[in-house]
C-alpha cells in the first residue's frame, strides 16, 4: 500500500481551488504562449517542506520533479535558510563583481577543487543558459573558430548560441545563429547499446572533425540528456568522444547543468566514464538550493582568453553564493552523492519491476536520481506524448508531481530531491506505477 504525502503545517492563507482558473487566465494574458504550464488544471505551489509541497488547491504533493532539479535539497532546508537570512541581515544582497565578494571567492575556490580540472578558474552567472553562452564565447575565442559540435537530442538553453547547439529538433530552426554547428549521436535508442554503438558514434565525430574547413572550437555534451528524458550516453561514449576531440586540439565542454552536484550518483556526470577531463564545465540548477546561480569552471588558459574586460552584474551575488556554500556543505556532510546512487538504484528497480509488462511502457532510463520513463502507444509501439501526459495527470491525482520530456514529449521525468528518504522512494514509485497502470488499462480498452 502507498501513503499520501504527509500534511504540511496549516497556514492562514486561503487556498480555494477556484482561484487557479483565474490565475491561469492572468498567466496567459501577461506571459508569452511559449511558456507552457503543467497539467490541465494548472498548479500553484504555495509552500513546502522537505520533499512535500502544498498547492493552491489545498492539497499536499510529494515532489519528484524538484523545480526541474533546482530544489536539489528539497524545501525549507534549515541550513540554507539560515545562510540566506544571515546574509540578508547584513543589508547587502547585491554589489556587482566590481567589488570583492567573500562568499563568491570561497565558492569559486571550492568548485575549482571539486571540478578535477587542472589549474581551474570559475565565473558565475545567473542561469544554465547564460553559463552555456559563456562557455561557447570562451571556446570560440580561445580556438578562434565559430565551429562547434554538439549532440543530437541535446538541450542547452534558450539563448542565441545555446539554441544553436541544441540538438533537440523541436528547437532547431528557431532563429539565425553566428555559430556553425554539426551534430553527432547522443544517447542510444536501445538500452543495451555497447561497443559497436560507441565505435559508430566515434567514427561519425571523427569524420566531422576531419572534414571541417578549419579548426573546430569545441564539442559540447550532456553526460545524461535531461530534457530528452534522462537519456544517458552509452558507457564509454563520452570518453571516446573526449579522446578524439583532444587528439585534434578542440575543447570539451561538459554541460552539467542537470547532471552536476551528485544527482547521477557521481559528483559530475562526466565521471561515469574514465579518462574524461573537460576543458570547460558548465553548472547551475541546484547549486544554490533553489536560488538563481550558474557558472563555468575551466582551465585557466581558456578562462583567461577574453581580450576585453567583462563582468556579471548579478552572477555570483552575495545571497546566491552564501546559499551555494551551505548547499555544498550539506552535499558533502551527508554524502548525498553516494545516497543518490543508492536511492536512484532502488527507485529505478521499483519502477522497472512495477511497470514490467505494461504495453505502454518502453523503458526506464537514466542514472542516479535523474530518471525517465519512456512511454509508447500500445497499438503502434511509437513514442506517445499523449500517454506520458496522461500518466503525469494521473500522478498528480495520486499526489505525486513529475515532469515531462523526451524528444517527442513521450517521457515522464523523475528527479526527486537528493534528500529523498527510503520511505518516500517507495511511496513515489508506488504512486507512479499506479498511475501508469491505470493509464495503460484505459489506453488498451479505448
Where in the sequence are the language-model features?
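Short, Lys/Arg-enriched N-terminal segments with co-localized hydrophobic residues
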Residues: 4-17
Amino acid at each position: 500500500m502507498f501513503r499520501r504525502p504527509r500534511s504540511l503545517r496549516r497556514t492562514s492563507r486561503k487556498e480555494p481551488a477556484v482561484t487557479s482558473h483565474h490565475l491561469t487566465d492572468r498567466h496567459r494574458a501577461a506571459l508569452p504562449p511559449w511558456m507552457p504550464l503543467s497539467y490541465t488544471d494548472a498548479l500553484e505551489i504555495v509552500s513546502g517542506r522537505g520533499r512535500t509541497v502544498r498547492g493552491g488547491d489545498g492539497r499536499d504533493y510529494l515532489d519528484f520533479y524538484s523545480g526541474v532539479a533546482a530544489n536539489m535539497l528539497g524545501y525549507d532546508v534549515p541550513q540554507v535558510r539560515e545562510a540566506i537570512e544571515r546574509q540578508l541581515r547584513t543589508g547587502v544582497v547585491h554589489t556587482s563583481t566590481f567589488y570583492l565578494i567573500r562568499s563568491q571567492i570561497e565558492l569559486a575556490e571550492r568548485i575549482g577543487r571539486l571540478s578535477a580540472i587542472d589549474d581551474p578558474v570559475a565565473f558565475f552567472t545567473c542561469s544554465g543558459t547564460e553559463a552555456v553562452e559563456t562557455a561557447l564565447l570562451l571556446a570560440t575565442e580561445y580556438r578562434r573558430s565559430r565551429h562547434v559540435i554538439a549532440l543530437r537530442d541535446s538541450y542547452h538553453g534558450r539563448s542565441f548560441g545555446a539554441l544553436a547547439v541544441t540538438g533537440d529538433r523541436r528547437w532547431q530552426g528557431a532563429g539565425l545563429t553566428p555559430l556553425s554547428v554539426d551534430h553527432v549521436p547522443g544517447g542510444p535508442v536501445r538500452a543495451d547499446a555497447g561497443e559497436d554503438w560507441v565505435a559508430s558514434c566515434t567514427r561519425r565525430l571523427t569524420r566531422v572533425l576531419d572534414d571541417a574547413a578549419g579548426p573546430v572550437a569545441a564539442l559540447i555534451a550532456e553526460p545524461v540528456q535531461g530534457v530528452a528524458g534522462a537519456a544517458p550516453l552509452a558507457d564509454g561514449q563520452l570518453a571516446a568522444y573526449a579522446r578524439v576531440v583532444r587528439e585534434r586540439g578542440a575543447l570539451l565542454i561538459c554541460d552539467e547543468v542537470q547532471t552536476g552536484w551528485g544527482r547521477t550518483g557521481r559528483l559530475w556526470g562526466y565521471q561515469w566514464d574514465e579518462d574524461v577531463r573537460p576543458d570547460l564545465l558548465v553548472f547551475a540548477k541546484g547549486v544554490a538550493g533553489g536560488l538563481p546561480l550558474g557558472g563555468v569552471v575551466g582551465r585557466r588558459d581558456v578562462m583567461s582568453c577574453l581580450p576585453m574586460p567583462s563582468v556579471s552584474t548579478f552572477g555570483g551575488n552575495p545571497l546566491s553564493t552564501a546559499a551555494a556554500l551551505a548547499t555544498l556543505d550539506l552535499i558533502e556532510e551527508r554524502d548525498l552523492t553516494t545516497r543518490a546512487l543508492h536511492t536512484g538504484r532502488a527507485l529505478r528497480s521499483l519502477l522497472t519491476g512495477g511497470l514490467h509488462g505494461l504495453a505502454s511502457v518502453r523503458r526506464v532510463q537514466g542514472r542516479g536520481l535523474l530518471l525517465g520513463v519512456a512511454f509508447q502507444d500500445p497499438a503502434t509501439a511509437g513514442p506517445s506524448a499523449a500517454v506520458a501526459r496522461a500518466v503525469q495527470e494521473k500522478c498528480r491525482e495520486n499526489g505525486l508531481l513529475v515532469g515531462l520530456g523526451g524528444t517527442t514529449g513521450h517521457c515522464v521525468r523523475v528527479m526527486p530531491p537528493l534528500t529523498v528518504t527510503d520511505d518516500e522512494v517507495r511511496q513515489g514509485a508506488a504512486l507512479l506505477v499506479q498511475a501508469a497502470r491505470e493509464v495503460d488499462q484505459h489506453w488498451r480498452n479505448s
